């Protein structure tokens, strides 16, 4: 048992440090995960996204936490030669080890690894590991039988140390709970608008329902994907393992750089006071697989980006517009795209302030490009002469990120048992090109049947489609779907993965007819 003292110390010290680190801004595990993710080869990352989808990032993060624990065991073993030191000296040695780890992290990781909270975290990491070694040493009898004299005195000392340890754990738990509560309040507070919402800010759901019901005629309302996605159901993809929480009271948006004559700084209230417009826009993640659900539609309200650029006096030399965000994310758009009236700096989503996970207090929304080109938690806007290589581009993903034509079968669901009166339905999307036709095949693509199309909410959203036909009882039905965009180009049948420019191919479903 005595030989396990320091490895166990490393395990317990590491776990304590990992738990405590989640209350630091930013947590060490997040920095390590972000850094490791940024150096992961793009092809491997794309493969993992295709195969693991939404569970990939949590698994990656848990792996990083596991590495922290292993590092704690290694650190504890490094302290073994110092095991005979008195407690104050041992704790000092632990702090010294933490300082060495902090310096190594700064050299290897750079950036946020030099933040005071992280440096302090490494120092505490070493101290906690050393302290855990002392406690476990006493528990295993080494301290009780030797350094502290009589066994009874050793036991009393151990009980006192154990009580202190338990108290420390309880205090840490209480602090963690308080931190979570404060964080939750921060998220709630930051998601609230700077002032009361005006009636004109709200989506008129009745008007939306009148102009486009969002369900196929003659079908139950729950049968198809709604034309407008509720905020709670809107897909979420982020490079971060823990997203930033931004306080609207201290936030500002800056239009800056050498290519503007009059730099502008706007508060949240000032941004919301500017003339605005609303657009229905569908966003799709570039990592969305064929038939995947990383695609949603919302009504976005904000200030046209071109108005802000003109207000700042953008110079003629500008060719691109770059964005930086609260989480360190950078992205850029070609100038012609930035000047489109539909490219917005938005602050409302479906009539509500942007949820924190969707970029509160402001984000970019543009049309015809994958979600990576719509940065969240916006902080600065800067006209530039060349494109900025963003997070995804550095991993080999497409710089243009133009949406490809896609179509999806939502009804019936895969392997569902259906009646002979068979109804198919789903969505099709082609960015700014629109959808001209959707077709369904039940004979492997030999023949195609035209589907009925619902009128889209705007030229920039998906189109709902449906088709009814008779099927023979007891049969197995295999269905394929394809779409034709507004230019007349038919969706490609060639199947490709999402990396590096978006997936292609036909969505397919198989059903049993009762």
Residue ranges and their predicted role:
Residues 23-26, 69, 112, 178-514:
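Structured, non-membrane catalytic/scaffold regions adjacent to prosthetic-group chemistry
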Residues 148-166:
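N-terminal secretory signal peptides and thylakoid transit peptides that target proteins
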């Amino acid at each position: 048992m005595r030989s396990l003292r320091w490895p166990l110390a490393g395990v317990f010290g590491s776990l304590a440090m990992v738990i405590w680190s989640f209350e630091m801004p930013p947590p060490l595990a997040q920095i390590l995960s972000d850094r490791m993710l940024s150096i992961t080869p793009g092809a491997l990352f794309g493969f993992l996204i295709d195969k693991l989808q939404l569970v990939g990032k949590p698994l990656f993060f848990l792996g990083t936490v596991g590495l922290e624990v292993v590092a704690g065991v290694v650190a504890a073993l490094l302290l073994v030669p110092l095991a005979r030191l008195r407690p104050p000296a041992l704790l000092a040695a632990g702090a010294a080890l933490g300082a060495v780890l902090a310096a190594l992290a700064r050299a290897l990781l750079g950036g946020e690894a030099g933040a005071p909270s992280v440096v302090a975290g490494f120092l505490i990491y070493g101290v906690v590991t050393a302290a855990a070694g002392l406690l476990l040493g006493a528990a295993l009898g080494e301290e009780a039988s030797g350094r502290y004299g009589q066994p009874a005195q050793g036991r009393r000392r151990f009980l006192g140390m154990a009580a202190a340890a338990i108290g420390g754990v309880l205090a840490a738990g209480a602090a963690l709970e308080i931190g979570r509560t404060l964080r939750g309040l921060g998220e709630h507070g930051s998601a609230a608008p700077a002032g009361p919402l005006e009636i004109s800010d709200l989506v008129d759901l009745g008007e939306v329902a009148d102009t486009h019901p969002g369900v196929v005629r003659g079908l139950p309302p729950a049968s198809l994907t709604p034309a407008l996605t509720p905020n709670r159901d809107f897909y979420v993809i982020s490079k971060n393992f823990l997203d930033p929480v931004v306080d609207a009271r201290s936030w500002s948006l800056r239009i800056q750089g050498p290519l503007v004559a009059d730099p502008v700084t706007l508060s949240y209230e000032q941004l919301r006071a500017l003339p605005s417009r609303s657009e229905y826009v569908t966003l799709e993640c570039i990592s969305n697989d064929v038939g995947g659900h990383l695609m949603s539609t919302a009504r976005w309200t904000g200030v046209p980006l071109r108005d802000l650029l003109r207000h700042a006096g953008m110079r003629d030399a500008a060719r691109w517009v770059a964005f930086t965000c609260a989480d360190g994310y950078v992205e850029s758009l070609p100038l012609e795209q930035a000047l489109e009236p539909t490219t917005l700096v938005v602050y409302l989503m479906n009539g509500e302030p942007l949820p924190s996970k969707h970029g509160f207090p402001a984000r970019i929304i543009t049309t015809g490009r994958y979600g990576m080109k719509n940065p969240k938690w916006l902080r600065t806007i800067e006209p530039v002469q060349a494109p900025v290589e963003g997070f995804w581009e550095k991993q080999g993903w497409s710089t243009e990120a133009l949406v490809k034509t896609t179509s999806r079968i939502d009804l019936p669901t895969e392997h569902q048992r259906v009646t002979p009166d068979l109804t198919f339905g789903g969505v099709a999307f082609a960015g700014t090109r629109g959808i001209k036709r959707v077709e369904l095949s039940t004979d492997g693509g030999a023949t195609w049947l035209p589907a009925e199309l619902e009128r889209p909410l705007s030229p920039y959203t998906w189109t709902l489609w449906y088709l009814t036909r008779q099927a023979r009882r007891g049969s197995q039905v295999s269905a394929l779907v394809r779409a034709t965009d507004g230019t007349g180009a038919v969706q490609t049948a060639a199947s490709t993965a999402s990396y590096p420019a978006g997936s292609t191919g036909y969505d397919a479903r198989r059903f049993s007819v009762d």
